[in-house]
């Protein structure tokens, strides 16, 4: 199986740095897949559950938030604001964040408030989705 190097980093830590066979993620346009030999690519990511298939084809799932993903020279680098493995997610905290975001969307006062609330809701929903997997 063809493989490539994957690095997922946040301002606080590196979550993964190793060989993988496939990555499935999401940007504002929709889902995308990265395989070995992918053409150079740069995109902004959105909060989602990112799927990582290791060199043996086994899947791991990771919450990734907003940030950038770069593909170059058979290496994929995620620089995201936050990322968490399923066991690191505080389900109660994510549920509270979801409820707060939904309340802010109901009582929005301006466009900036709405954008922030939608982003917070997307983060919370992605964390909860990963926790349920």
Curated annotation (Swiss-Prot):
UniProtKB keywords: ATP synthesis, Cell membrane, CF(1), Hydrogen ion transport, Ion transport, Membrane, Transport
This protein's record includes keyword Metal-binding: no
One GO cellular component term noted in the UniProt record for this chain: proton-transporting ATP synthase complex
SUPFAM superfamilies: Epsilon subunit of F1F0-ATP synthase C-terminal domain, Epsilon subunit of F1F0-ATP synthase N-terminal domain
Membrane topology recorded in Swiss-Prot or TrEMBL: Peripheral membrane protein
A GO MF term: proton-transporting ATP synthase activity, rotational mechanism
Keyword Aminoacyl-tRNA synthetase among record annotations: no
Subcellular location: Cell membrane
InterPro entries assigned to the protein according to its UniProt record, in alphabetical order: ATP_F1_dsu/esu_C_sf (IPR036794), ATP_synth_F1_dsu/esu (IPR001469), ATP_synth_F1_dsu/esu_N (IPR020546), ATP_synth_F1_esu_C (IPR020547), ATPsynth_dsu/esu_N (IPR036771)
Chief place where the protein resides: membrane
HAMAP family: ATP_synth_epsil_bac (MF_00530)
Family the entry assigns: Belongs to the ATPase epsilon chain family.
Function, in words: Produces ATP from ADP in the presence of a proton gradient across the membrane.
Subunit field text: F-type ATPases have 2 components, CF(1) - the catalytic core - and CF(0) - the membrane proton channel. CF(1) has five subunits: alpha(3), beta(3), gamma(1), delta(1), epsilon(1). CF(0) has three main subunits: a, b and c.
Record protein name field: ATP synthase epsilon chain
